[in-house]
Amino acid sequence: MFVDRLIESVKAKKTPVVVGLDPRIEMIPDFIKEEAFRRKGNGVEGIAEAMYLFNKGIIDAVYDLIPAVKIQVAFYEAYGIEGFKAFFRTAEYAKSLGLIVIADVKRGDIQDVAKMYSKAYLQNPLFDAITVNPYMGEDSMVPYLEDVEKFGKGIFVLVKTSNRSSKDVQDIETKKGGYVYQEVAKMISRLSKVIVGKYGYSSIGAVVGATYPFEAKILREEMPRCYFLVPGYGAQGATAEDVVNCFDEEGYGAIINSSRGVIYAYRSDFWKEAYSEYEYGQAAREEVILMTGMINNALVKRKYIAS
């Protein structure tokens, strides 16, 4: 079962940190682009090669530290078929090193179409879990739920996202007295009862933004069986203290994603004096170690205060 594998990897690595592989060609080190363009030319094939080589360097640097990577498909789709090849190659390489692979695809459509999305990703052995948009209702999620159970995969359903304007829709008050995001949470919590692993968590998880710690506390109570995928740490402004409400009392229940903050750490003010572009992987590794320490310390502090 996906969620059991995830929890066991989190325990083994002693970190909830997930690295997002969102390569932007303009931010990839020049030496990688030069090599990729030498091999494949400076068109889309060369760009896709540069993205893959960059990702491979990040994975090599952090795979022993983290339980999973999250690959955002949009950064690859932008380059057509060649971009998709880089997307799948990245997933394959991460899997070869024992990492859990989350495809951040945010799919959502009517049930008949959702079957095809689910076939494309949840029935693909390269991917362990995907992100899903629930806006079209419960029946649109049925194909994903069926494949989660049949193939031992997972989904993370968008509930309260990290972007600033998420409140425009997700915080609309309902006739029942709560907010839209709470109604989605209730639906996900109900669905999560069907597929529960040996640690008490479900393979039906939720996306809950680190930039909304107050709402995260509410949602942790609303969805006690749901593992949270938490974006918004680092580049979007959330801190270790902001994410603690996503965790249960034992320090589990959430994985915290950082994309730009890790993969472009070598360009940050904090690390750029210590690491050159040739050492981008080492900078990423140090950022993961720092992030892990900060989150774990924040969790210890919360537990101490609570006691």
Swiss-Prot record:
InterPro entries with a match to the protein in the record: Aldolase_TIM (IPR013785), OMPdecase_type-2 (IPR011995), OMPdeCOase_dom (IPR001754), RibuloseP-bd_barrel (IPR011060)
Enzyme class at the top of the EC tree? lyase
Q: Which UniProt keywords apply?
A: Decarboxylase, Lyase, Pyrimidine biosynthesis
Q: Name one GO molecular function term.
A: orotidine-5'-phosphate decarboxylase activity
Q: Which reaction is the catalytic activity of this chain?
A: orotidine 5'-phosphate + H(+) = UMP + CO2
Report the EC number(s), separated by commas if there are several.
4.1.1.23
Q: Where is the active site?
A: K106
Give the top-rank taxon of the lineage listed in the UniProt record for this protein. Bacteria
In the record, the note on similarity to other proteins reads: Belongs to the OMP decarboxylase family. Type 2 subfamily.
Which protein are we looking at? Orotidine 5'-phosphate decarboxylase
* Originating organism: Caldanaerobacter subterraneus subsp. tengcongensis (strain DSM 15242 / JCM 11007 / NBRC 100824 / MB4)
